[in-house]
């Protein structure tokens, strides 16, 4: 399972304080 950017955005929206962790996860996807 590979989460899409939309999935990560939804995750971030539900976990406001975890935005930094979400950003770290989102970085490698477009690369």
UniProtKB/Swiss-Prot annotation:
Record's protein name: LysM-domain containing protein
Source lineage: Eukaryota, Viridiplantae, Streptophyta, Embryophyta, Tracheophyta
Top-rank lineage group of the source organism: Eukaryota
Annotated LysM repeat ranges: 1-28
